[in-house]
């Protein structure tokens, strides 16, 4: 079994926060207390924990990941963060089959995930299924530039490629921003298809 200790430390590091700050990314969609959010591909909680802090004790955050080691690290990080663990529901599942109730989520976030999704049609069907009609969808991913960290350049999607994938799967991009030196953020809404 692979040791994820160093990866978890890096995923939760201040260095990474300088690349793309979760609080800033969430402010771009106006998170309010009591919202229900989903972090698809949550890993050890880099976005999950700030999402829980933003939505507060009356909110709910679903943290979905297939990697049990990452989810165990998430549990540890939640305990250390002081966030009420009752507002975070951890789901060990593929991001295309989450089990999250239909039409229940105000904000769906997937960070550094889209370039890895093999069955994008199934993934976006699930995103649409769990989203409220008024939901915001946030895609944060690696810019298609050469960097020291991150996936190989050939696996990355440019902003235009990601926008096209989103559009083809029923989501319109309403805002595009830099999410730091290595990442972009696309804020979307479900469209009628």
Task: Name each region found by the language model.
Residues 2-19:
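Class I SAM-dependent methyltransferase Rossmann-like catalytic core
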Residues 17-36:
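Conserved alpha-helix/loop element of class I SAM-dependent methyltransferases that forms part
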Residues 38, 44-97:
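Class I SAM-dependent methyltransferase SAM/SAH-binding core
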Residues 96-107:
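A short acidic, Gly/Pro-enriched loop at the edge of an enzyme's catalytic core
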Residues 106-119:
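A short SAM/SAH-binding and catalytic strip from SAM-dependent methyltransferases
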Residues 121-136:
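A short glycine-rich, Lys/Arg-flanked "PGG" loop and its adjoining helix->strand segment in the class I
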Residues 138-161:
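Conserved class I S-adenosyl-L-methionine
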Residues 175-193:
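Core SAM-dependent methyltransferase catalytic element
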């Amino acid at each position: 079994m692979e040791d994820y200790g160093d990866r978890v430390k890096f995923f939760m590091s201040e260095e990474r926060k300088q690349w793309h700050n979760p609080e800033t990314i969430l402010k771009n969609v106006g998170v309010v207390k009591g919202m229900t959010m989903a972090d698809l591909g949550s890993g050890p909680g880099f976005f999950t924990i700030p999402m829980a802090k933003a939505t507060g004790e009356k909110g709910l955050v679903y943290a979905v990941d297939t990697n049990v080691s990452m989810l165990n690290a998430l549990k540890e990080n939640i305990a250390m963060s002081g966030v009420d663990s009752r507002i975070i529901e951890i789901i060990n599942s593929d991001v295309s089959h989450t089990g999250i109730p239909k039409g229940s989520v105000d904000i769906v976030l997937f960070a550094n995930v889209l370039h890895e999704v093999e069955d994008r049609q199934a993934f976006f069907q699930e995103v649409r299924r769990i989203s409220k009609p008024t939901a915001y969808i946030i895609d944060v991913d690696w810019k298609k530039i050469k960097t020291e960290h991150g996936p190989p350049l050939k696996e990355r999607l440019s902003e235009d490629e990601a926008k096209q994938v989103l559009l083809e799967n029923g989501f319109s991009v309403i805002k595009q921003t830099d999410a730091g030196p290595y990442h972009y953020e696309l804020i979307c809404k479900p469209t009628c298809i």
